[in-house]
């Protein structure tokens, strides 16, 4: 269920402060964050944000198509290694 329009998008304050500082200084270094729940705003476009996936930080280059989505959607937390192989069929 989406967030109410009257509340507006949620962005952690510390992340928003880092983004504003990077835009003001025209700094292109990746911004490291653990806030997967923050929504991507139009101010984030063009920046690289390193989102934590539980083990390491995944660099996410924000484009216009990502606006309105959450940061965690672009940093997968699980690695799929395929289903188990049938040992009987190998013989």
UniProtKB/Swiss-Prot annotation:
Q: Does the keyword Electron transport apply?
A: no
Source organism, top-level taxon: Bacteria
Give the matching InterPro entries.
Ribosomal_uS19, Ribosomal_uS19_bac-type, Ribosomal_uS19_CS, Ribosomal_uS19_SF
Instruction: For this entry, list what GO says about its biological process.
Output: ribosomal small subunit assembly; translation
What are the record's GO terms for cellular component? cytoplasm; small ribosomal subunit
One GO MF term attached to the UniProt entry: structural constituent of ribosome
The free-text function statement in the UniProt record for this protein reads: Protein S19 forms a complex with S13 that binds strongly to the 16S ribosomal RNA.
Instruction: Please report which protein family the annotation says this sequence is part of.
Output: Belongs to the universal ribosomal protein uS19 family.
What organism does the UniProt record list as the source? Answer: Acinetobacter baylyi (strain ATCC 33305 / BD413 / ADP1)
Q: Which UniProt keyword terms apply here?
A: Ribonucleoprotein, Ribosomal protein, RNA-binding, rRNA-binding
UniProt keyword Cell division, yes or no: no
Query: Pfam family of this protein, just one?
Result: Ribosomal_S19
By what name is this protein known? Small ribosomal subunit protein uS19
What Gene3D superfamilies does this protein map onto? 30s Ribosomal Protein S19, Chain A
């Amino acid at each position: 269920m989406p967030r109410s329009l009257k509340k507006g998008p949620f962005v952690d304050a510390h992340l928003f402060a880092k983004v504003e500082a990077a835009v003001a200084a025209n700094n292109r270094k990746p911004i490291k964050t653990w806030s997967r729940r923050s929504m991507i705003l139009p101010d984030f476009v063009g920046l690289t944000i390193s989102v934590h996936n539980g083990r390491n930080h995944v660099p996410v280059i924000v484009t216009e198509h990502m606006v309105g989505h959450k940061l965690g959607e672009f940093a997968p937390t699980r690695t799929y290694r395929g289903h188990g192989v049938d040992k009987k069929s190998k013989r």
